[in-house]
Swiss-Prot record:
Biased amino acid composition, Polar residues: 11-22
Region (Disordered): 1-24
PANTHER family: 26S PROTEASOME REGULATORY SUBUNIT
Name of the molecule in the record: 26S proteasome regulatory subunit 6A
SUPFAM superfamilies per UniProt: P-loop containing nucleoside triphosphate hydrolases (SSF52540)
Amino acid sequence: MSTLEELDALDQSQQGGSSNNEGLDGIEQEILAAGIDELNSRTRLLENDIKVMKSEFQRLTHEKSTMLEKIKENQEKISNNKMLPYLVGNVVEILDMQPDEVDVQESANQNSEATRVGKSAVIKTSTRQTIFLPLIGLVEPEELHPGDLIGVNKDSYLIIDKLPSEYDSRVKAMEVDEKPTERYSDIGGLSKQIEELFEAIVLPMQQADKFRKLGVKPPKGCLMFGPPGTGKTLLARACAAQSNATFLKLAAPQLVQMFIGDGAKLVRDAFALAKEKSPAIIFIDELDAIGTKRFDSEKAGDREVQRTMLELLNQLDGFSSDDRVKVIAATNRVDTLDPALLRSGRLDRKLEFPLPNEEARVGILRIHSRKMAIDDDINWEELARSTDEYNGAMLKSVCVEAGMIALRQGDTKINHEHFMDGILEVQMRKSKTLQYFA
């Protein structure tokens, strides 16, 4: 079998060789059949083709070297133009220019790409100059929008870089970097308020798809009102700790500024920062400082406070409102707030924080004393009955005073009598019935 296979392979190789010889013979026959004049003309044509190819090769090589030199020169120009410091400016408007509207100067080193007409820009620099740029610079026009902060060359005014958005330093300080340690389990007697706040603020951020499926638009904000010491700020801190959203805490008295328009600018910057870092929660404490009912006044300070509140109304449900930014407001004087703040579409969910009842007082006392060394024979129900009309802050003071009394007496554990003495200590400070509303 091996001998037959070798013979077949030899026959195939001979057939392939004969076919190659036939091809060579065919070429040789064609050349042999041609005359001398035809061969000379073919040779001259080939030589001309070679000369044309060589000249084309030389031209392309020269163009390549020229383009490399231009690229190197342009890179040096770009590096020189990008040398710091930049001149800071703002984009006023982006324009679409037609070819017949721009007069492009003719020069020897300009090509079709350099004279290409596209988008132009109007900018305003920090030196209060308004400048028109036929060529924008190193930033793509699609990335620029009116109002953007930019860095321009101080000589040619070409846009070199797009700078990050500028916010007031006071607004940046409002962002809570370290999350609070409070949890919902640290709040006693407010289970209904916790559930409603979770449904209105946290749930739309964590499970937005459920709201979209049902076609329900979640509330934009939540207003917490009630007497002092009932846990409004504590619940807001727990909400910040349990949610993964950016949390901005601002007190309404911070928004009352001396200069006209300064408070409204703080409100705009706070909401702009929240939109940039969305989802976000803005907590406004002591809302009654800026949210009082509007009235006619000749004092500039009163008018400035009202302008600040109007800016807050615009941010809550104006053209620039954002569903990914939730607002939590807290106040002790809900009766003095402007009706425009309380209407639906702004602060939709209203949560009342009343004084805790007897069952809630038991839960609050247990929460504040769970890390304390206490006896097992403490009657929490009796302590709750003895602390009628106490708010959560006063109940915490009772636990602190009981611990101080036990420490003063040298005891190693806090018993029921210590708590009763603590109640008397807090009661002496409460000289009269607390009235927080006029």
